[in-house]
Every structure is written in C-alpha cells, then in structure tokens.
C-alpha cells in the first residue's frame, strides 16, 4: 500500500529542491526527517512538511505504521513560471523567471526480509 502527498506551485526553483530531494529518496521516514532538519537549504522545511503530510496520510487513510514506512518515490517537477521584468541600462529591460515546483512524495511500507 502506498500513501502520497503533493505540494503544488511552491515558490522554490525545482533545481534547488531536487538537491534536497536526492538526500532522502529511498530512506526510512524517521531518518529522512532527521536529515531534513539538519540540512541548511531553503527547500528543507518545505519538503519536510510534504513528507509529514505523506506520513499522516499513510497513518490516517491506510492505517499503516509510521515506524515501518520508507520513501518509495520522491520527485520534483517544474510548475508554472512567474515572469518579471527588471529595468536595465539605456531603456532596456531583462526578464527574471521566478520558478515554481510541484513536490511529490510517496511512502510505502517496508518490505519484509
């Protein structure tokens, strides 16, 4: 059985969020929460919130044991980009892309053996 949590249109660049996501993929949820607490990146608290949501979904919806959960899938997709313009010299303007992310975490029960 699998439980899933998704955070859509989060205001962090996918490239930066993937650096943190790579640290926790495939780990047990207790270990993953510890890693996220000690990782000094802006994406860490956001990903931790999604992970805790996935754990809560597993406990509440599917009555799984939280101590027996493993992160089976964890990925970051690109969301819509907010386009802003910054004035530059000689009347020009340059575009600034404020990127967003869709963060997905799937937890499942650890296989026996």
From Swiss-Prot:
Q: Which InterPro entries match?
A: Ribosomal_uL22, Ribosomal_uL22_bac/chlpt-type, Ribosomal_uL22_bac/org-type, Ribosomal_uL22_CS, Ribosomal_uL22_sf
Task: Specify the superkingdom.
Answer: Bacteria
Q: Which molecular-function annotations from GO does this UniProt entry contain?
A: rRNA binding; structural constituent of ribosome
Provide the GO biological process annotations.
translation
Which is one Pfam family of this protein? Answer: Ribosomal_L22
Keywords per UniProt: Ribonucleoprotein, Ribosomal protein, RNA-binding, rRNA-binding
A single GO CC term for this protein reads: cytosolic large ribosomal subunit
* Assembly, per entry: Part of the 50S ribosomal subunit.
The record's similarity note reads: Belongs to the universal ribosomal protein uL22 family.
Q: What does this protein do?
A: This protein binds specifically to 23S rRNA; its binding is stimulated by other ribosomal proteins, e.g. L4, L17, and L20. It is important during the early stages of 50S assembly. It makes multiple contacts with different domains of the 23S rRNA in the assembled 50S subunit and ribosome. The globular domain of the protein is located near the polypeptide exit tunnel on the outside of the subunit, while an extended beta-hairpin is found that lines the wall of the exit tunnel in the center of the 70S ribosome.
Name this protein carries in UniProt: Large ribosomal subunit protein uL22
């Amino acid at each position: 059985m699998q439980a899933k949590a998704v955070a859509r249109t989060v205001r962090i660049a996918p490239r930066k969020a993937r650096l943190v996501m790579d640290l926790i993929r495939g780990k047990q949820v207790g270990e993953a929460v510890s890693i996220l607490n000690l990782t000094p990146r802006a994406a860490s608290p956001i990903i931790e919130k999604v992970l805790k949501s996935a754990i809560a979904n597993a406990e509440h919806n599917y009555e799984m044991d939280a101590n027996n959960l493993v992160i089976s899938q964890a990925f970051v997709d690109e969301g819509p980009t907010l386009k802003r313009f910054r004035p530059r010299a000689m009347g020009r303007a340059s575009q600034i892309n404020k990127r967003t992310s869709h963060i997905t975490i799937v937890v499942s029960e650890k296989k026996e053996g």
